[in-house]
A protein has these predicted regions:
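Iron-sulfur-associated redox domains of electron-transfer enzymes in respiratory
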Residues: 57-181
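Iron-sulfur cluster-binding cysteine motifs and their immediate structural context
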Residues: 1-41, 45-61
């Protein structure tokens, strides 16, 4: 910009690029943002920071609707925080009733997975502590991706316990082999 006395050269900060914690967003020769899939940890920060909605996550709503219409065993899962998103009258029980009314086979509170994860991970961490090893949590898939892609030397420190969502999904599939979560 200093090379041009008329300030005709502008470099605008793009929220998506500057929100990316691993610098996975660059620009091509036409100035179009490009996400480097080999660096991206799939945290979603770019999606939430883009004021134009230019970056989006894949929606499976049509797939879910089609599966419900076909009578497949579709299970809904939600984190306990959703209970507070829609007012005092909404509870996990009302969520469950609503999902079943929409055609879902059943509804599970992912808080159950948090309890399962805490139980398994505490055992794993106790063993690591006895062995003098360090451990970090594996509950956040984006964090696990970041460690594997950008800090591979620390990959052995990541707990092998699955996320709460995955734990509940596995529980459902153990109970119903035809389940889709």
């Amino acid at each position: 910009a200093q090379a041009c006395p008329y300030n005709a050269i502008a470099h605008l900060k793009r929220p998506c690029k500057f929100s990316c914690p691993v610098n996975a967003i660059t620009y091509d020769e036409h100035g179009i943002s490009v996400i480097d899939k080999k660096k991206c940890i799939r945290c979603g920060k770019c999606i939430h920071s883009c004021p134009f909605g230019a970056i989006g996550s894949k929606s499976f709503i049509v797939d879910v609707i089609n599966a419900l219409r076909e009578g497949k065993h579709i299970y809904a899962m939600a984190a306990p925080a959703t209970e507070g998103q829609f007012g005092d009258d909404i509870t996990m029980a009302s969520w469950k009733n609503a999902m079943k009314e929409l055609g879902f086979t059943d509804f599970f509170d992912v808080g159950l997975g948090g309890d399962m994860t805490a139980a398994y991970e505490s055992e794993e961490w106790a063993e690591a502590y006895k062995a003098g090893e360090k451990k970090v949590t594996s509950c956040c898939p984006a964090f696990v991706n970041m460690v594997r892609l950008h800090y591979p030397d620390l990959a052995d420190c990541v707990s092998t316990t699955v996320s709460p969502m995955c734990a509940v999904s596995r529980l459902i599939k153990a109970r119903d082999p035809e389940a889709i979560t």
